[in-house]
Amino acid sequence: MPELPEVETVRRSLAGRITGLTIEKVELRLPKIAFALPGTLFTDALRGRRIIELGRRGKYLLLHLDGDETLVIHLRMTGRLIHLRPEEREEPEAAHTHAVFFLDDGSLLRYTDVRQFGTLTLMTREAALRQPGKGRLGPEPLGQDFSFVDFRNALVKRKTKLKPLLLDQSFLAGLGNIYADEALARARLHPDRTADSLDDEESRRLYDCIRTVLQEGIDAKGTSFRDYVDGEGRKGEFQEKLWVYGRGGNPCRRCGGEILREKRAGRSTHFCPRCQK
């Protein structure tokens, strides 16, 4: 599933290509993925709208349109949003293409999704910034208002284990399985530790490592195992730099011990039992 670094990479790759362009029409081939404001049709509501800015909130991509509305795109497990310039639009269409946006410069924006879990939702800009999905979102880990003091105060109030806490989007927006495992590994913290058991120094390590691993993921253009590519169809490179995720049975990059892969609440968790306490 695309996490914060992947969605931010998609945003950056598309911003210079489609900002300022107008949506001439939309072909929607899988209606169940698209939602519009009450009383409007998705395709009609987008026709003639200009894309004025691309943003992101957590794992949600935000296409801000004129008229103070926003198209919220949640890629979920296997969603892809790829832009094709006019000279590229004759390229064969990928299987599972569920929506095509025709832009006024002759280019196309194609949304594909093998698993069909992703959604395209048109809402007011204010609503998109406040709550783009069903649940309330926590702070942005790379945001200027995400301070260590606030993070530490939030930790001491939680008896939740660290791994599920980092996956809780109401606690922090944007982390998923990959970057939660990586942050805990770098911070040398066991995923089963409870948040309230961390002392100040451990909390600071976790705070710093969350921000570091997310920024490194962005710098590497995301993590590509199977489905993820950016808005130009390019794979990321962070999979080559992972410490624990996807490396079960391999030696720890820090101590040489064996990386374990275990199930936690139905999710795979990767960690080094020697380093992470």
Swiss-Prot record:
PROSITE patterns: FPG_CAT (PS51068), ZF_FPG_1 (PS01242), ZF_FPG_2 (PS51066). Binds 1 zinc ion per subunit. InterPro entries: DNA_glyclase/AP_lyase_DNA-bd (IPR015886), DNA_glyclase_Znf_dom_DNA_BS (IPR015887), Formamido-pyr_DNA_Glyclase (IPR020629), FPG_cat (IPR012319), MutM-like_N-ter (IPR035937), Ribosomal_uS13-like_H2TH (IPR010979), Znf_DNA_glyclase/AP_lyase (IPR000214), Znf_FPG/IleRS (IPR010663). Keywords: DNA damage, DNA repair, DNA-binding, Glycosidase, Hydrolase, Lyase, Metal-binding, Multifunctional enzyme, Zinc, Zinc-finger. Its cofactor is Zn(2+). It catalyses: Hydrolysis of DNA containing ring-opened 7-methylguanine residues, releasing 2,6-diamino-4-hydroxy-5-(N-methyl)formamidopyrimidine; 2'-deoxyribonucleotide-(2'-deoxyribose 5'-phosphate)-2'-deoxyribonucleotide-DNA = a 3'-end 2'-deoxyribonucleotide-(2,3-dehydro-2,3-deoxyribose 5'-phosphate)-DNA + a 5'-end 5'-phospho-2'-deoxyribonucleoside-DNA + H(+). NCBIfam families: fpg, PRK01103.1. Monomer. This is Formamidopyrimidine-DNA glycosylase. It comes from Heliobacterium modesticaldum (strain ATCC 51547 / Ice1). The gene is mutM.
